């Protein structure tokens, strides 16, 4: 259920303002209880106090947790302390957490709570956290929209509320100037019931603690220096921006249509009662008007209240952020409509179709709040058109705590009425089954089983742990991605260098292969060089023989002199050649027949040549013999002559006388 009341501040969970250096004007703080008369709102006895009272609240920067005493009053007024870890934990007992408190930061509060005391203590931890821690805190603050579920009711029994005096020992907190209302005294009357939920107490040191996600809120924005109470209404107003033509439909669901954003936070339609009752109640939200003409620069902030049409649960909301302008006419119109809506005799409350009122507002972001069993976080992180600053996401426990405030916390006492329909809401809250969102207040009274509360608490813790791991995994994934990109870049460079080396190696291999082929060719030609050198000598004889062969062929084929132009009929030439071939074939038969005779003649001629050679030898021998015969004939003649002469000598001697 949406809590949209910012006219009064919950004394059990007061907001922590920023340091004086971080305020709007950077100087003196403005009083928190300043009453400004409205120029537009019509006077109404039911909410004359709340409609003309504005408070100046600031958003917080870091989350914190504080411990409380056994009484609920001390628990609700305890101071929060920053935690370095986004996943906060709470102490199990109130007594253990009280022992860890810092006396300097948590001074004793006197019995008079109406006295305004300047507080010089300011806790600023925005600069102590690193960027990674801030990112981690931011990542654990928002619940996913997948957590949306149907609302359900628990089989519990309402106990009659008793009235008791408020606890005297209250811890003072910075900038706390309002007294404890009567409606808070009813809750402070049963300190024993508050001992049932171990996570109700807060630890006051800087260790990692988990705030009670059912009753407290977290805000980890780095631009806020003080710690403040977490309410959905204030976070909604802090996240919402000014737009020209938005609309707010109030029909049991707060839907601020602000620019067509698709991120919504639903505060549920249906709060079911027990199965045997079979009754469902719808939540109706109303905006009470701001008493000033505009809300800007943190001066005076408007008030939002969300009243249930059936059970009337009301929880206060955070104030509007700075520089967000909202006309008082808008608040006046909204307030008047919702007073008529809550009036039993008005036609708006009688007809279900008129319960949805479209309101022209100046919000800039779209928010939808659902009162389902699982809380949702508002989609922050979007820059304001007025301030231009980023808004951080809300805590999961903040949405749960603000939407699960008990009916008694939101009920107004007779001495302090918030609006005209508070009595009707008190009656509704006493008679109707509370929502699943009323865990934090009802568990202090012991009205709801601890098993379901523990389940919801563990769900929130596990979801925060899941967000932490998701953040760690995302950071690891980013690191792995960077390493992967670097590795891919290195691999690419290595591949390029390897390709260049391969190209150079390929070129060198080609050159080596060519050199090997050249060497092989040289080795082959080296053996043939002698024959090639001899070929130059043989070429002349070969060319002369070829020229003689060509000339003989020409002489045998071309017997007619060809001079000048010669025209030859190819067909006639063909017939002539064919006839010549026929004649040659006929001659060849005769030539073959004569070849035998020629062979015989050739053999005879060979024999004749042999005989002739022999005759020649014999003739030469005869010539020698003839020459010798002639010489011998001459000798013979001389001899014959001598013989003749010798035969004639004696005759002559006888004839001559002896002397």
From Swiss-Prot:
Disulfide bonds: none
Residue span of motif QWRF motif: 468-471
Domain of life: Eukaryota
Record GO cellular component, one term: microtubule
Compositional bias ranges of the Polar residues kind: 90-102, 206-216, 291-303
TM stretches of this protein: none
InterPro entries assigned: QWRF
Segments of this protein annotated with the region Disordered: 1-125, 157-221, 291-317, 340-359, 371-429
Compositional bias (Low complexity): 42-72, 345-359, 401-418
Basic and acidic residues compositional bias, start-end: 172-190
Family: Belongs to the QWRF family.
Protein name: QWRF motif-containing protein 2
Species assigned in the record: Arabidopsis thaliana
UniProt gene name: QWRF2
């Amino acid at each position: 259920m949406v809590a949209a009341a910012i006219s009064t501040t919950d004394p059990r969970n007061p907001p922590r303002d920023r340091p004086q250096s971080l305020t709007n004007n950077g100087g003196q703080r403005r009083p928190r209880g300043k009453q400004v008369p409205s120029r537009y709102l019509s006077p109404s006895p039911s909410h004359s106090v709340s409609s003309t009272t504005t408070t100046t609240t600031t958003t917080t920067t870091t989350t914190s947790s504080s411990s409380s005493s056994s009484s609920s009053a001390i628990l609700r007024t305890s101071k929060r302390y920053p935690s370095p870890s986004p996943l906060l934990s709470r102490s199990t007992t109130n007594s253990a957490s009280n022992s860890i408190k810092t006396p300097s930061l948590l001074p004793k509060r006197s019995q008079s709570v109406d006295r305004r005391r300047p507080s010089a203590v300011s806790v600023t931890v925005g600069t102590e956290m690193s960027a990674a821690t801030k990112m981690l805190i931011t990542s654990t603050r928002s619940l996913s929209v997948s957590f949306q579920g149907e609302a359900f009711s628990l089989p519990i029994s309402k106990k009659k509320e008793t009235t008791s005096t408020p606890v005297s020992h209250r811890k003072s907190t910075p900038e706390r100037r309002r007294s404890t209302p009567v409606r808070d005294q009813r809750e402070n009357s049963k300190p024993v019931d508050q001992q049932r939920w171990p996570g109700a107490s807060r630890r006051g040191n800087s260790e990692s603690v988990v705030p009670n996600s059912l009753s407290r809120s977290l805000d980890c924005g780095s631009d806020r220096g003080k710690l403040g109470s977490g309410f959905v209404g204030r976070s909604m107003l802090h996240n919402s921006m000014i737009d020209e033509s938005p609309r707010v439909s109030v029909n049991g669901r707060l839907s601020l249509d602000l620019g067509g954003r698709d991120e919504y936070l639903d505060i549920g339609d249906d709060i079911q009662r027990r199965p045997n009752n079979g009754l469902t109640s719808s939540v109706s939200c109303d905006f009470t008007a701001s008493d000033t003409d505009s809300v800007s620069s943190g001066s005076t902030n408007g008030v939002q209240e969300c009243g249930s049409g059936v059970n009337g649960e009301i929880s206060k909301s955070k104030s509007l952020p700075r520089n967000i302008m909202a006309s008082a006419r808008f608040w006046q119109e909204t307030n008047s409509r919702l007073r008529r809506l809550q009036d039993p005799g008005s036609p708006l409350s009688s007809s279900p179709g008129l319960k949805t009122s479209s309101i022209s507002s100046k919000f800039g972001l779209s928010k939808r709040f659902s009162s389902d069993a699982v809380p949702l976080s508002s989609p922050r992180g979007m820059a304001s058109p007025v301030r231009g600053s980023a808004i951080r996401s809300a805590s999961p426990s903040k949405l749960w705590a603000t939407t699960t405030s008990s009916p008694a916390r939101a009920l107004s006492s007779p001495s302090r009425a918030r609006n005209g329909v508070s009595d009707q809401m008190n009656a509704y809250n006493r008679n109707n089954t509370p929502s699943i969102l009323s865990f934090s207040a009802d568990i202090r009274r012991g009205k709801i089983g601890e098993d379901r509360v523990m389940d919801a608490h563990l769900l929130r813790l596990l979801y925060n742990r899941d967000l932490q791991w998701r953040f760690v995994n995302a950071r690891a994934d980013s690191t792995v991605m960077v390493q992967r990109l670097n590795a891919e870049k290195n691999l690419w460079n290595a591949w390029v260098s390897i390709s260049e080396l391969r190209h150079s190696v390929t070129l060198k291999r080609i050159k080596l292969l060519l050199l090997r082929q050249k060497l092989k060719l040289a080795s082959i030609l080296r053996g043939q060089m002698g024959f090639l050198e001899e070929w130059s000598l043989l070429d002349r004889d070969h060319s002369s023989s070829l020229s003689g062969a060509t000339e003989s062929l020409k002489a045998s084929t071309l017997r007619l002199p060809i001079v000048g132009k010669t025209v030859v009929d190819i067909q006639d030439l063909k017939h002539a050649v064919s006839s010549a071939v026929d004649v040659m074939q006929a001659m060849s038969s005769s030539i073959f027949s004569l070849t035998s005779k020629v062979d015989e003649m050739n053999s005879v001629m060979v024999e004749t040549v042999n005989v002739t050679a022999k005759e020649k030898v014999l003739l030469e021998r005869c010539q020698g013999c003839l020459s010798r015969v002639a010489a011998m004939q001459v000798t013979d003649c001389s001899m014959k002559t001598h013989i003749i002469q010798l035969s004639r000598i004696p005759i002559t001697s006888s004839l001559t006388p002896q002397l």
